[in-house]
Amino acid sequence: MAVRELSPARCTSASPLVLARRTKLFALSEMRWAALALGLFSAGLLTQLCGAPQWVRWALFLACYATGGWEPGLAGLQALQRRTLDVDLLMVVAAIGAAAIGQIAEGALLIVIFATSGALEALVTARTADSVRGLMGLAPGTATRVGAGGGEETVNAADLRIGDIVLVRPGERISADATVLAGGSEVDQATVTGEPLPVDKSIGDQVFAGTVNGTGALRIRVDRLARDSVVARIATLVEQASQTKARTQLFIEKVEQRYSIGMVAVTLAVFAVPPLWGETLQRALLRAMTFMIVASPCAVVLATMPPLLAAIANAGRHGVLAKSAIVMEQLGTTTRIAFDKTGTLTRGTPELAGIWVYERRFTDDELLRLAAAAEYPSEHPLGAAIVKAAQSRRIRLPTVGEFTAHPGCRVTARVDGHVIAVGSATALLGTAGAAALEASMITAVDFLQGEGYTVVVVVCDSHPVGLLAITDQLRPEAAAAISAATKLTGAKPVLLTGDNRATADRLGVQVGIDDVRAGLLPDDKVAAVRQLQAGGARLTVVGDGINDAPALAAAHVGIAMGSARSELTLQTADAVVVRDDLTTIPTVIAMSRRARRIVVANLIVAVTFIAGLVVWDLAFTLPLPLGVARHEGSTIIVGLNGLRLLRHTAWRRAAGTAHR
């Protein structure tokens, strides 16, 4: 049975409001044809039991053949044109053979069960497509764009361009990934980040398409086109993953061709040899048709893809995008995980951690006001952290003049008539003079740097007046994720970072990582990955920066955090954690392992049924109806078993396994 791919046509709709709906069963042509075939078969069986004329039974059963068998028959003929022997065609031939020897009811039963298993397969594909449609339906169809003169116009969200200003009213869905320019509100972004409570948003904060604005109005600047938004990337990656095949499936399909040819040869032998020993042609043909049916690898072919596709769809709904069935399959074989530091275990965005004032004329807010004003024209990340801290305290920044940037050292500007310099301790000690810097200030700088903080000195009119400690905040879930990863894989994770040893060791202690490798360049990270894998580890590497891309490519599986601003990193990674929640990494590994267990169970069920029925048919006499029912029944069992991973409880169960 051919595994159907997710059709892009099934993932589009004219109305965004319809996109989140689940596909109804009878919206699928496979379901309609299977139901019609079942109805005709039931009617034919009823007429047979009631003693109706033979032509009535035959008419109903032949109609069952046509409705349930035309799609697999056509698919089989098309495969034959490509010189491929398809199981679909073999099943139709077997059903026709059954009719040829007067066993039309049994052949119709085969058609019905085969059509039903095909409908179940289509249902798996449709449910995956539903997840894609649901994601695409999160973003609104229109947006209120604000013109240069302040006028408002309603436009299609797809027509928004980078830099456009959009007004988001209370209760509206946000139409694009953007930055807040004015206003304040709380935003429900559970659909993208998974956070259960609304998140406060103010000037400078990032918002995502498809999230819901709260009680305040926001004016936002578009950062990404609609096709590049977070939800669009999720949908694209889930769709692409659904069109791939796992290594197990590729192996099965490779073997299937040779198996099918051998099966046809044995079928011919089963038909041709017994008459030489006196068996009737009709009995030999019946045995041969029964053999062809029960030896068909339908259940084997269906064993692999439904569980993996269901796992991909479920993980996608929870913010983890596996780019292919191969990736979903490989995740479960992970024996060790390596994490980058900045942007992975930490948020990747510098934040102000503390203020130390060394002149009584300044308060904390006044010192921050001067430093933020001086840094406002700067494009340095540390300067942005200082400005954001001032904005979060709602400090109004004064006008700045005579701004000068000295890259890597400091910035200077005239603020309120004072010359303010903000920069590194090393650079500004030379400017201000070590004699002017109090001993307590020197001690504080040394201590904070030893603790892993970046220290910024604020100088007013050539006199140092305060210190600002800036840090890259540890993700709150990092320690829990490391603990879960250790329990799940049986090996403690590794920290691979380009940061200095002191900072890396401090973070390792915080999250529970003993194997810390610091000061690594991109090539060094690749070498570390290869060394770990040479020791037998199947390594999953988690990173976010462009410097992590080579290591992600070299790993058994590479996972990028959704905050990664590098397109190269996102393209190189095998999977993406869109919601930036580290705890989903152990969960998706547990989900992959469960999918692999279901695949193995399916293969055991399929092979056991086929082997048992083949032996029964060749060694004894297997009634055709019983052979059809048991063979196709095993196919349906395998298909339904794979569908279990589509349920929301499957993700919760995987999370429970990973974090117990």
Curated annotation (Swiss-Prot):
Binding-site residues, Mg(2+): D544, D548
Keywords assigned by UniProt, alphabetized: ATP-binding, Cell membrane, Magnesium, Membrane, Metal-binding, Nucleotide-binding, Phosphoprotein, Translocase, Transmembrane, Transmembrane helix
Subcellular location: Cell membrane
Gene3D superfamilies for the chain: Calcium-transporting ATPase, cytoplasmic domain N, Calcium-transporting ATPase, cytoplasmic transduction domain A, HAD superfamily/HAD-like
Family matches, as InterPro entries: ATPase_P-typ_cyto_dom_N, ATPase_P-typ_P_site, ATPase_P-typ_TM_dom_sf, ATPase_P-typ_transduc_dom_A_sf, Cation_Transport_ATPase, HAD-like_sf, HAD_sf, P-typ_ATPase_IB
Catalytic activity: ATP + H2O = ADP + phosphate + H(+)
Family: Belongs to the cation transport ATPase (P-type) (TC 3.A.3) family. Type IB subfamily.
NCBIfam families listed in its UniProt record: ATPase-IB_hvy (TIGR01525), ATPase_P-type (TIGR01494)
Protein known as: Probable cation-transporting P-type ATPase J
Organism: Mycobacterium tuberculosis (strain ATCC 25618 / H37Rv)
Gene transcribed to yield this protein: ctpJ
